Amino acid sequence: MADLSLADALTEPSPDIEGEIKRDFIATLEAEAFDDVVGETVGKTDYIPLLDVDEKTGNSESKKKPCSETSQIEDTPSSKPTLLANGGHGVEGSDTTGSPTEFLEEKMAYQEYPNSQNWPEDTNFCFQPEQVVDPIQTDPFKMYHDDDLADLVFPSSATADTSIFAGQNDPLKDSYGMSPCNTAVVPQGWSVEALNSPHSESFVSPEAVAEPPQPTAVPLELAKEIEMASEERPPAQALEIMMGLKTTDMAPSKETEMALAKDMALATKTEVALAKDMESPTKLDVTLAKDMQPSMESDMALVKDMELPTEKEVALVKDVRWPTETDVSSAKNVVLPTETEVAPAKDVTLLKETERASPIKMDLAPSKDMGPPKENKKETERASPIKMDLAPSKDMGPPKENKIVPAKDLVLLSEIEVAQANDIISSTEISSAEKVALSSETEVALARDMTLPPETNVILTKDKALPLEAEVAPVKDMAQLPETEIAPAKDVAPSTVKEVGLLKDMSPLSETEMALGKDVTPPPETEVVLIKNVCLPPEMEVALTEDQVPALKTEAPLAKDGVLTLANNVTPAKDVPPLSETEATPVPIKDMEIAQTQKGISEDSHLESLQDVGQSAAPTFMISPETVTGTGKKCSLPAEEDSVLEKLGERKPCNSQPSELSSETSGIARPEEGRPVVSGTGNDITTPPNKELPPSPEKKTKPLATTQPAKTSTSKAKTQPTSLPKQPAPTTIGGLNKKPMSLASGLVPAAPPKRPAVASARPSILPSKDVKPKPIADAKAPEKRASPSKPASAPASRSGSKSTQTVAKTTTAAAVASTGPSSRSPSTLLPKKPTAIKTEGKPAEVKKMTAKSVPADLSRPKSTSTSSMKKTTTLSGTAPAAGVVPSRVKATPMPSRPSTTPFIDKKPTSAKPSSTTPRLSRLATNTSAPDLKNVRSKVGSTENIKHQPGGGRAKVEKKTEAAATTRKPESNAVTKTAGPIASAQKQPAGKVQIVSKKVSYSHIQSKCGSKDNIKHVPGGGNVQIQNKKVDISKVSSKCGSKANIKHKPGGGDVKIESQKLNFKEKAQAKVGSLDNVGHLPAGGAVKTEGGGSEAPLCPGPPAGEEPAISEAAPEAGAPTSASGLNGHPTLSGGGDQREAQTLDSQIQETSI
């Protein structure tokens, strides 16, 4: 501190340091503000520049603000100048690698510094860069730290990120590697600042150098995810995510956010991403070939960041991940082996970074896989929000799948390329749409992101993309067992994705595209379902059609799935419990429905093929949606999808019916799957597929209460079917709010079970009951396997059990229902039995909801609406899909049970009516009883009041009448009537009241008396007061004073004064003086006492002033002299006579 402070003090930077410190505080505040979980869709980019202007006036502002704004807008050019301006790191390309790494480290150090203010420490390891960057870097840090996420990110991160974008390999590496390293290292290092910085330095260098492409993706995602986490979540959580260092993370989270955001160049990147968003799809494709995964990821992330400015935070995580994932999936699909290799390097390099930057589940997970899994686990556990990190241990286990997946990858590579094209098309398009959707869904993801399911979601998305990545990423997974572990971590969530990706990869490279289209798109589809449903129904159809075509394609992939089935089976090997993957089974349901929807598309063949493929394709299919559900996002999205799909169903015109059916069927399957996934959290947790899905949901539920949010989102989204048009936004809002609510209410243990109960009820609605018998044990066993996640999500596990049962039994049913008709039957069974199970699931729900009356009521109505949704979805989805009576039967049972069940079967619904009825009863009773009581009490009070004056009769009569009437108006009327009657009858009582008032009147009299006494005091003797109280006191005092005034002008005051002296000397009785006064003006001395009143009266009228004087004289002949003398005459008492006479004569003369 001292050295740097001295150096800076000697040089210009010391103000910068001060400014930076100030900015540090501001940055902390800003970071917290940005942590707005509400999801500042108003881009931090937009917001922070204002803060920058305020905070960073001066070097930082000029450098950083222009840099941040420019770099945000121009990003690459601006960022480079920013680096130059900030740290002279203008060399973004290779120089950035060294310089930005140092610079980022320095930034981290500076961020750390503002927080720690450990210039020496930071300087120690960062000093060399700092020396160069130090003055400027102070600004970068100030900027960086100050803008916290936006500006510093923009200048430094934007520079670095611009480097990421412009020199995406190195800059990303540097910006990223540093950001992740710094973020990863620095967050931890931030805890250990000194250690941190050197660590980040050394760390960054390898990472930046080693990870160049991937670190970009990972750090980018890391930063963004963390940033999102940080922004959306408290910096502490973000850092918890980042570092898992909850303690240090608080401050570092900001810094990390700053570092991440900055490293991510979030705002800049976001803005750049805005521009790049436009570019990024192209860049995506170019980058895809480019395999600048980081670039693509950056671009995509930027693209998504574009949206991110809107949903920047959530979108950051999602978008970063999404584009990263999508780009990564495209790039990774194209380059994945390389990137996978890079990813392993990343894993190796990112090990640290991942360990530290564990928040980025994608990268962190790979790192985790490498060595950091434990650390990641710690971090993840610490940053439990990042479930993926938690999952990495699982991932460490699941690597098998990923390892197996590489075979898939080998097989899938062509498929991946195909999927690549598709993914690039669908992923890129979908990514774009997804990005678009992401913004809205990212908003939803904001909630999720808040919960960090988004990370999982994003990771799932990444995994979705990674399924492509997983396809290629199986190589990546091979290399990135970390990422495969991430995928396992993701497998927690991404297991699904990876299974989805794997299954997807297996069956759906096409189907993965379906899954990507669906998974990637469903996130987009879900998201796009939001958007797509709204805007992209065709795309959703495309996704669904894609799904349909992929269904065929899935059949073709089924051949691939033959291989992929091996991979799938291998994946199920991992997902062995769910080899019939619960998800797979729901997929059969979904696929059944989808297959039914895609019936024309070789529905039976597809289903059979999918099911034959171990229903892996179907699981893939279903996993896509279920992954969607499994994904935090997807959980919400399935809900959204439900609503959106229902929306689609509502918007059947919007979506072609095939799409509608597909989307609706998918929506049903997805919502249902989502429900099972949500409910199947435990279930999914149970098996890798389930684990994939549920771990993310369930883990989400545990650490994040995201499962609750997810379930809540699902249930709420389902619940929100009523607001289906609003659903995208409501889900987004609801997703956010509800997830926060879920966090708020969902965090409450009761809430998760309730929502999970709802979810489980709904998943139960799907296959819950069908699955219930056998899968319970299976589901429980897998759940036990998933027990690590399960403990926190025990409620979810219960729901998961049902959902597992649902999924497992559905798998059985799906397996049994290999054929389309059989699928229909399971579909039909699903609605029917799940309805009963819904009832079962909802008794707990009812109880829980009863505990949670309002939330429960919401859930119940939502459940009802969801049932209606399911009805509608099942009807529309199944009817077209099944096209057979079963769908109608399903429809009929669903309507009766959803209608009836929501009320009858849905005990929650029954509870709701009952609750509502009790409320109504309470309200009615309360209204009636309170009204009666209130009326009586009021009437009684009124009566009591009136009774006291009015008498007992009024009370009795009033009470009797009031009791008979029991109504205020009548009671009041009676009271009034009785009151008047009582008053008329007992006016004496009223008089008594008056008497009591008389008491107060006596007080008034006392007041008057006091006033009179006051006046009397000036007036003079009490004797005269008795005689002349009223007239004299009132008239004489005022008139006398006035007369005296007139006399003063009229006559010499000196005389009055001399009179005062004389008066005092002569001091005679006032009475005499008054009489004499009156006599003098009036002339009648004989009337002295008796005529005191007469004298004033008589002379008063005749002698205008004299009477006034005489009047004044009578009361105060002194008052006349009393103007000056009166008070004194009172003292003198007598002496008024001569003086008064003298005064009077003089006054008379004067007046005359």
Swiss-Prot record:
<feature type="modified residue" description="Phosphoserine">
    <location>
        <position position="723"/>
    </location>
</feature>
<keyword id="KW-0832">Ubl conjugation</keyword>
<dbReference type="GO" id="GO:0015630">
    <property type="term" value="C:microtubule cytoskeleton"/>
</dbReference>
<feature type="modified residue" description="Phosphothreonine">
    <location>
        <position position="585"/>
    </location>
</feature>
<dbReference type="GO" id="GO:0046785">
    <property type="term" value="P:microtubule polymerization"/>
</dbReference>
<dbReference type="GO" id="GO:0003723">
    <property type="term" value="F:RNA binding"/>
</dbReference>
<feature type="modified residue" description="Phosphothreonine">
    <location>
        <position position="380"/>
    </location>
</feature>
<feature type="modified residue" description="Phosphothreonine">
    <location>
        <position position="571"/>
    </location>
</feature>
<feature type="modified residue" description="Phosphoserine">
    <location>
        <position position="643"/>
    </location>
</feature>
<feature type="repeat" description="17">
    <location>
        <begin position="532"/>
        <end position="545"/>
    </location>
</feature>
<feature type="compositionally biased region" description="Basic and acidic residues">
    <location>
        <begin position="644"/>
        <end position="653"/>
    </location>
</feature>
<feature type="modified residue" description="Phosphoserine">
    <location>
        <position position="624"/>
    </location>
</feature>
<dbReference type="GO" id="GO:0043005">
    <property type="term" value="C:neuron projection"/>
</dbReference>
<feature type="modified residue" description="Phosphoserine">
    <location>
        <position position="696"/>
    </location>
</feature>
<feature type="compositionally biased region" description="Polar residues">
    <location>
        <begin position="704"/>
        <end position="725"/>
    </location>
</feature>
<feature type="compositionally biased region" description="Low complexity">
    <location>
        <begin position="861"/>
        <end position="878"/>
    </location>
</feature>
<feature type="compositionally biased region" description="Basic and acidic residues">
    <location>
        <begin position="371"/>
        <end position="384"/>
    </location>
</feature>
<feature type="modified residue" description="Phosphoserine">
    <location>
        <position position="1000"/>
    </location>
</feature>
<dbReference type="GO" id="GO:0051012">
    <property type="term" value="P:microtubule sliding"/>
</dbReference>
<feature type="modified residue" description="Phosphoserine">
    <location>
        <position position="5"/>
    </location>
</feature>
<feature type="repeat" description="13">
    <location>
        <begin position="462"/>
        <end position="475"/>
    </location>
</feature>
<feature type="repeat" description="1">
    <location>
        <begin position="248"/>
        <end position="261"/>
    </location>
</feature>
<feature type="compositionally biased region" description="Basic and acidic residues">
    <location>
        <begin position="839"/>
        <end position="848"/>
    </location>
</feature>
<feature type="compositionally biased region" description="Basic and acidic residues">
    <location>
        <begin position="769"/>
        <end position="786"/>
    </location>
</feature>
<dbReference type="Pfam" id="PF00418">
    <property type="entry name" value="Tubulin-binding"/>
</dbReference>
<feature type="repeat" description="26 residues 1">
    <location>
        <begin position="352"/>
        <end position="377"/>
    </location>
</feature>
<feature type="modified residue" description="Phosphothreonine">
    <location>
        <position position="521"/>
    </location>
</feature>
<feature type="modified residue" description="Phosphoserine">
    <location>
        <position position="941"/>
    </location>
</feature>
<dbReference type="GO" id="GO:0140778">
    <property type="term" value="F:microtubule stabilizing activity"/>
</dbReference>
<feature type="modified residue" description="Phosphoserine">
    <location>
        <position position="510"/>
    </location>
</feature>
<feature type="repeat" description="9">
    <location>
        <begin position="408"/>
        <end position="421"/>
    </location>
</feature>
<feature type="repeat" description="Tau/MAP 2">
    <location>
        <begin position="992"/>
        <end position="1022"/>
    </location>
</feature>
<feature type="modified residue" description="Phosphoserine">
    <location>
        <position position="825"/>
    </location>
</feature>
<feature type="modified residue" description="Phosphoserine">
    <location>
        <position position="827"/>
    </location>
</feature>
<feature type="repeat" description="26 residues 2">
    <location>
        <begin position="378"/>
        <end position="403"/>
    </location>
</feature>
<keyword id="KW-0007">Acetylation</keyword>
<feature type="modified residue" description="Phosphoserine">
    <location>
        <position position="14"/>
    </location>
</feature>
<dbReference type="GO" id="GO:0005886">
    <property type="term" value="C:plasma membrane"/>
</dbReference>
<feature type="repeat" description="3">
    <location>
        <begin position="276"/>
        <end position="289"/>
    </location>
</feature>
<feature type="compositionally biased region" description="Polar residues">
    <location>
        <begin position="68"/>
        <end position="81"/>
    </location>
</feature>
<feature type="compositionally biased region" description="Polar residues">
    <location>
        <begin position="911"/>
        <end position="929"/>
    </location>
</feature>
<feature type="compositionally biased region" description="Low complexity">
    <location>
        <begin position="788"/>
        <end position="819"/>
    </location>
</feature>
